[in-house]
Amino acid sequence: MELIIATRKSKLAQVQTEKVMELLKEKENVDSKKLLVMTEGDRRLDVSLNKIGGKGLFVKEIELALLNKEAHGAVHSMKDVPFELPSEFELVAMPEREDIRDAFVSLNGSTLSNLRKGARIGTSSIRRAEQLKLFRDDLEIVPIRGNVQTRIKKITEENLDGIILAAAGLKRLGMEDVISDYFDPKVFLPAIGQGALGIECLKGGEFNDYFKALDSKEVRTTVEAERSFMKVLNGGCHSLIGAYSEVKDNDLYMIGTFTVNNRIVKKDILGNKEDNILLGKKLAEKILGEV
């Protein structure tokens, strides 16, 4: 038997899927192969995500492959997955979470603190752009899209002083050496689910148990808390929303940020990790209480 796993065509998406394939072989002794799918988010690289719908643009065509029984499961970056899935699907596993931090990439090794005044920084993320302005309001934010390799090329092509990328993607691609600096995730909050992988299947799928065996309880605890936070705030690519969460013993600690009445609000919460979804909701309500 060979499981078919749908994923995007990008190098990073394929590397992430290969990691899941390795885990399937290692834990379940099951062979698998990739089904590469071109998503709307991959096709429309000329427009910023917040103008064409944001979250879900990297998921819909892949879900169609599951619906058409062309694949048994799909691997996503959790930060691309909308907080509400269509009723036919479920997230059966979140197998691993890489480094959750954002990374600063510059070709000359500059760090954020020693950049020239008015430096040009590339990012298409409102979350990154708004938090960056809190550090250095003199910086010029330049919107860029494309895969990791394309964005790095744009440093030269668009005369940028640097760009911001997720550390997880760079590490998975073996490109850690291009990182000049890391952002403290408790200060510069990551995207919801950043660094985490998710496996989506049709509900009640015949082979779902193979994928479920790869689930990490700790990863699921943190990511579900963050997604609960996002759901209350209805946040996506068009708004500043970020969260940091960590499990320590029986506790879950979370920090969240969101824009309320044009003001960036940041709050934290601590509670029992078994109440992860409730804690995410309470943190969101705490932030909305600032209205």
Curated annotation (Swiss-Prot):
Its EC number is 2.5.1.61. Pathway: Porphyrin-containing compound metabolism; protoporphyrin-IX biosynthesis; coproporphyrinogen-III from 5-aminolevulinate: step 2/4. Its cofactor is dipyrromethane. GO terms for molecular function: hydroxymethylbilane synthase activity. InterPro entries: HemC (IPR000860), Porphobilin_deaminase_cofac_BS (IPR022419), Porphobilin_deaminase_N (IPR022417), Porphobilinogen_deaminase_C (IPR022418), Porphobilinogen_deaminase_C_sf (IPR036803). It comes from Clostridium perfringens (strain ATCC 13124 / DSM 756 / JCM 1290 / NCIMB 6125 / NCTC 8237 / Type A). Binds 1 dipyrromethane group covalently. One of its GO terms (biological process) is protoporphyrinogen IX biosynthetic process. Belongs to the HMBS family. The porphobilinogen subunits are added to the dipyrromethane group. One of its GO terms (cellular component) is cytoplasm. This is Porphobilinogen deaminase. PROSITE patterns: PORPHOBILINOGEN_DEAM (PS00533). Monomer. Tetrapolymerization of the monopyrrole PBG into the hydroxymethylbilane pre-uroporphyrinogen in several discrete steps. PANTHER family: PORPHOBILINOGEN DEAMINASE. It holds the Pfam family Porphobil_deamC. It catalyses: 4 porphobilinogen + H2O = hydroxymethylbilane + 4 NH4(+). The keyword Transferase applies. Keywords: Porphyrin biosynthesis, Transferase. The modification S-(dipyrrolylmethanemethyl)cysteine is found at residue 237.
